[in-house]
C-alpha cells in the first residue's frame, strides 16, 4: 500500500481518530490527566461486553480443538503480539498444561518482546512462515490480534490458517476490518479513539487483554482444569505456588493443613490428585485411575 493510500486508510479508522475528551491533556495536572484516562478506560469492558457472543463462540471452537489434540495459537505485532505471548506463557503454571498447548507468536520473534523491530508487521509472507515454523495445522485455532484490523503480518497468518481449513478468529478495535473479513469469528472491541491519538496500547490493548483472559480461562475451565473456582492444576514450581497448592487442597476438601501437606507429598504436589484422594478416600493409584477415566475432570470423577 502506498504512503498516500495508507494515510487515507488510517484516517478512517476509529483507533486513529482524535479523542475530543483528551484534547487538552498537555495542560492538565497529574490528577486531572489520570482521571481522563480512567474515564476512558471505563468504556473498555462495555465494549467487550458487546462481543460476548463471539467470544463464547471462539471458546467453543478452542475447547473442541483441545479435545481433538489441537492448539490455540495467538499471533500479532507489537503490543498485540506481546499480549498474546503473555497470555500463552501464563497457561502452563496456571493450568498445568504443556507450553505447546497455547502458543504466542509475535512479529519479529523473541527480540520484538522488548524492542521494536522495524517493518516486522508489514511482511504478509512472514505471518504465514511463522505459522509454518510451529507446524500449524487444520486441528489448531488461530487468533489474529491487531487493534487496526489491517496488520499485513496478521492478515498473512489468517489467510494461511484459513487455507488449511483451521478455525480463525480476529480481535480488532475497528469495525469491518480486513481481518474480520477473513476470520471465521470476528471479535470487534470498539473502544473508541485513544486518549493519546493512535496509541492502541491503551484502550485497545486493554480490551485485547480482557478478551484473551476470557478465551484461555473459559476454555481451560471447560476442559476440566479447575474445580469450583480453584486452580487445581496449578504447577507448584515455587514457594508461593506450593503454599497456594496447600491452600487449594484445604479449601476444596475442608481438611487441615497437616492433611493437605501430607497428601500433597504423596501426590507429588499434584493438587487435583490430592483433592481426589481426600474426597474419595482413596489411595494415589485409585485416584489417578478415577481421574483418567473422566479425562481429568475432578467434579465428574467425584460424582461416580
Curated annotation (Swiss-Prot):
<comment type="subunit">
    <text>Homodimer.</text>
</comment>
<comment type="function">
    <text>Specifically catalyzes the cleavage of the D-lactyl ether substituent of MurNAc 6-phosphate, producing GlcNAc 6-phosphate and D-lactate. Together with AnmK, is also required for the utilization of anhydro-N-acetylmuramic acid (anhMurNAc) either imported from the medium or derived from its own cell wall murein, and thus plays a role in cell wall recycling.</text>
</comment>
<comment type="pathway">
    <text>Amino-sugar metabolism; N-acetylmuramate degradation.</text>
</comment>
<protein>
    <recommendedName>
        <fullName>N-acetylmuramic acid 6-phosphate etherase</fullName>
        <ecNumber>4.2.1.126</ecNumber>
    </recommendedName>
</protein>
<comment type="pathway">
    <text>Amino-sugar metabolism; 1,6-anhydro-N-acetylmuramate degradation.</text>
</comment>
<dbReference type="InterPro" id="IPR046348">
    <property type="entry name" value="SIS_dom_sf"/>
</dbReference>
<feature type="active site">
    <location>
        <position position="121"/>
    </location>
</feature>
<dbReference type="GO" id="GO:0016835">
    <property type="term" value="F:carbon-oxygen lyase activity"/>
</dbReference>
<dbReference type="GO" id="GO:0097367">
    <property type="term" value="F:carbohydrate derivative binding"/>
</dbReference>
<dbReference type="GO" id="GO:0097173">
    <property type="term" value="P:N-acetylmuramic acid catabolic process"/>
</dbReference>
<dbReference type="GO" id="GO:0046348">
    <property type="term" value="P:amino sugar catabolic process"/>
</dbReference>
<dbReference type="InterPro" id="IPR040190">
    <property type="entry name" value="MURQ/GCKR"/>
</dbReference>
<feature type="active site" description="Proton donor">
    <location>
        <position position="90"/>
    </location>
</feature>
<feature type="domain" description="SIS">
    <location>
        <begin position="62"/>
        <end position="225"/>
    </location>
</feature>
<dbReference type="InterPro" id="IPR001347">
    <property type="entry name" value="SIS_dom"/>
</dbReference>
<dbReference type="GO" id="GO:0016803">
    <property type="term" value="F:ether hydrolase activity"/>
</dbReference>
<dbReference type="InterPro" id="IPR005486">
    <property type="entry name" value="Glucokinase_regulatory_CS"/>
</dbReference>
<dbReference type="GO" id="GO:0009254">
    <property type="term" value="P:peptidoglycan turnover"/>
</dbReference>
<keyword id="KW-0119">Carbohydrate metabolism</keyword>
<comment type="similarity">
    <text>Belongs to the GCKR-like family. MurNAc-6-P etherase subfamily.</text>
</comment>
<dbReference type="GO" id="GO:0097175">
    <property type="term" value="P:1,6-anhydro-N-acetyl-beta-muramic acid catabolic process"/>
</dbReference>
<dbReference type="Pfam" id="PF22645">
    <property type="entry name" value="GKRP_SIS_N"/>
</dbReference>
<keyword id="KW-0456">Lyase</keyword>
<dbReference type="InterPro" id="IPR005488">
    <property type="entry name" value="Etherase_MurQ"/>
</dbReference>
Amino acid at each position: 500500500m502506498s504512503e498516500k493510500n495508507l494515510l487515507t486508510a488510517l484516517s478512517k479508522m476509529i483507533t486513529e481518530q482524535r479523542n475530543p475528551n483528551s484534547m487538552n491533556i498537555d495542560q492538565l495536572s497529574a490528577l486531572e490527566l489520570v482521571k481522563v484516562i480512567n474515564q476512558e478506560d471505563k468504556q473498555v469492558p462495555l465494549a467487550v461486553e458487546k462481543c460476548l457472543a463471539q467470544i463464547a463462540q471462539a471458546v467453543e471452537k478452542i475447547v473442541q480443538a483441545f479435545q481433538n489434540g489441537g492448539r490455540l495459537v495467538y499471533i500479532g505485532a507489537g503490543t498485540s503480539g506481546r499480549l498474546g505471548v503473555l497470555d500463552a506463557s501464563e497457561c502452563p503454571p496456571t493450568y498445568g498444561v504443556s507450553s505447546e498447548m497455547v502458543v504466542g507468536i509475535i512479529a519479529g520473534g523473541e527480540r520484538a518482546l522488548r524492542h521494536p523491530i522495524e517493518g516486522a508487521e508489514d511482511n504478509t509472507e512472514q505471518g504465514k512462515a511463522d505459522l509454518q515454523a510451529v507446524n500449524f495445522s487444520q486441528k489448531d485455532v488461530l487468533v489474529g490480534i491487531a487493534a487496526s484490523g489491517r496488520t499485513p503480518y496478521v492478515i498473512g497468518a489468517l489467510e494461511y490458517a484459513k487455507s488449511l481449513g483451521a478455525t480463525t478468529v480476529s480481535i480488532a478495535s475497528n469495525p469491518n476490518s480486513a481481518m474480520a473479513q477473513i476470520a471465521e469469528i470476528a471479535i470487534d472491541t470498539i473502544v473508541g479513539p485513544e486518549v493519546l491519538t493512535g496509541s492502541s496500547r491503551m484502550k485497545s490493548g486493554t480490551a485485547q487483554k480482557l478478551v484473551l483472559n476470557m478465551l484461555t480461562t473459559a476454555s481451560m475451565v471447560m476442559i476440566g482444569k479447575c474445580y469450583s473456582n480453584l486452580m487445581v492444576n496449578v504447577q507448584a514450581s515455587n514457594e508461593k505456588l506450593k503454599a497456594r497448592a496447600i491452600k487449594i487442597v484445604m479449601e476444596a476438601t475442608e481438611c487441615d493443613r497437616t492433611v493437605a501437606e501430607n497428601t500433597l507429598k504423596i501426590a507429588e504436589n499434584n493438587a487435583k490428585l490430592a483433592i481426589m484422594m481426600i474426597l474419595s478416600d482413596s489411595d494415589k493409584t485409585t485416584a489417578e485411575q478415577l481421574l483418567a477415566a473422566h479425562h481429568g475432570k475432578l467434579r465428574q470423577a467425584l460424582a461416580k
